[in-house]
Amino acid sequence: MLRRIKVGSNLNKKESLLDAFVKTYLQILEPISSKRLKELADLKISCATIRNYFQILSKEGMLYQAHSSGARLPTFKAFENYWQKSLRFETLKVNEKRLKSASENFGLFTLLKKPSLERLERVIECEKRFLILDFLAFSCALGYSVKMEKFLLELVGRSVKEVRSIAASFNALSLARQLERLEYSNTQITRFNLMGLKTLLNSPLFFDILGGKVLERLSKGLHFIEPDCMLVTRPVEFQNKRMQLLCVGKLECDYEGFFQTISEEE
């Protein structure tokens, strides 16, 4: 059912009309004429005034004309502007059943990743031949050297991610790769609606998104990754655990509606 849209009393503003246009488009996903926007968004201005704003917004690259009828569609620039203003990224309590169904209903690929809480507990020297890094949940071994032992002892108490990052920065690449494999195998990842990734099959980011590795280098928030796709990351509480949520989909997916639907508090 189409949601009635209210955009406030100051409807003569160009930004308000553009917001109303994008909100309406997200619900119907088809070109919008001035008459239809007035009806669906409940605008208290004339169709002629709306058409004038259509022309201005088209010149600014926010809208483009779909066909000779005068109906318009939002551009990438309009979506980018709208989502940057509309989305929030505070911690969200997530309902598991709603997350699964909403991912499919809204056409989004979603991934939940529980951050690894393991820390380097100790470094064990074995007869000057091996060094064993003990993270409690798992361990790894590498060849002994006095320099490496000293280096690792200074990292006791650090998280797996920190140890891996520091190892890579000091060119200890063998250790960094070993920790990456161990961390990945011990990370809890849950995926929903894999079909939501089909548009990214040829993207160089495909496997990093599928495996959740992209979360390591992206801050929470909004990221435009392809001409018609975007990625959203935010912290969530899922089954009483703090996790990271990754959402990927087309620009015209209703991300606001998705987050409202999966919220435990709704």
From Swiss-Prot:
Disulfide bonds listed in the record: none
InterPro entries for the chain: HrcA (IPR002571), WH-like_DNA-bd_sf (IPR036388), WH_DNA-bd_sf (IPR036390)
Key word NAD present: no
Protein's UniProt keywords contain Transcription: yes
GO process terms (BP): negative regulation of DNA-templated transcription
Domain of life: Bacteria
A GO term for molecular function: DNA binding
Keywords linked to the UniProt accession: Repressor, Stress response, Transcription, Transcription regulation
Functional summary from the UniProt entry: Negative regulator of class I heat shock genes (grpE-dnaK-dnaJ and groELS operons). Prevents heat-shock induction of these operons.
Family: Belongs to the HrcA family.
Full protein name: Heat-inducible transcription repressor HrcA
Source species: Helicobacter pylori (strain ATCC 700392 / 26695) (Campylobacter pylori)
The gene coding this protein: hrcA
